Amino acid sequence: RDKLHVEGFHAQNGVAHFAQVGQQLRQQGMALHDFLRQGAACVCQGDVAVLVDETSASAAEILAGAIQDWDRGVVVGRRSFGKGLVQQQFTLRDSSAIRLTISRFHTPSGRCIQKPYAEDYEDDIYKRYLHGEFYAEDSVFIDKADSLTFKTANGRTVYGGGGIMPDMFVPRDTSEVTPYFNKVNNSGLIHEFAFAYTDANRNTLKQFKTTEELESYLAKQDLCSKFTNFAEGKNVKKKSNQIAKSKNYIENLLKAYIARNTLGYNGFYPILHKKDNTLKKALDALHNNWQLLENNSVTDTLQNNFEDTSKVKQDNLEI
């Protein structure tokens, strides 16, 4: 429901955003429910970019898939997780409950968001990593079988089979990632230092009212050196070469977390996003009027292109 509320800002009234396809209990056969957004949309004009990666799942994928299928905006990042199941809860006599999977979500063009249930289902993300999918677009496996090939409103080819494939691929940036960084980051030491530093310097930090003022001050505090000393006290040995390679990354995170502790999320995101290549790519697409965004309003013509979506979705039903 939250996804529908958000997407109502981007599409005209009555346009089908996604389909919930599944087997309904107490009924025989299959049932198809199209969910329609009611009420006037607020943002039918203007460019839209949706950011996704391998951790984007469920409602995020429904939103991204609908935006992509209607050619309403550009999807930027990496292939999404592939989670599109619907569960219904049944209360038992002893007050316990069972949740039964009854449906799957499909995008307007008919693509099934849920990844296939195979024996190695739980290893999917790991297999993507081993295959190099996070780092090179040509390493992404796409099943181009006719049954998994679909068309967007403007006739672009998109593929089903699980998850949403972005229009613009952005690889993971590992240029500043080192074993040292992974150790201090995964152990929570960056967060811990940021809290400790904020508490120790709260009287000074509270003087800064804007992100720019706070970031300018923190840039002069040699945070990386102070942090590595802190980490050494937590039994993480210094690795000079690795620290030098990861310095900018570490300092960016430290400044962002300190800003969050001081100014809240209004201070956190502007600093953190300076290292976000996916966001930068999306902004470039918007600023340069990427070709997909030249035709950015949902019209009756787009609606007509999907007038037979019910048949498409039923033909591709997987239960």
What role is predicted for each listed range?
Residues 17, 22-25, 288:
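Local alpha-helix boundary/kink/capping signal
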Residues 112-113, 117-319:
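Conserved functional hotspot residues or short segments at active or partner-binding sites
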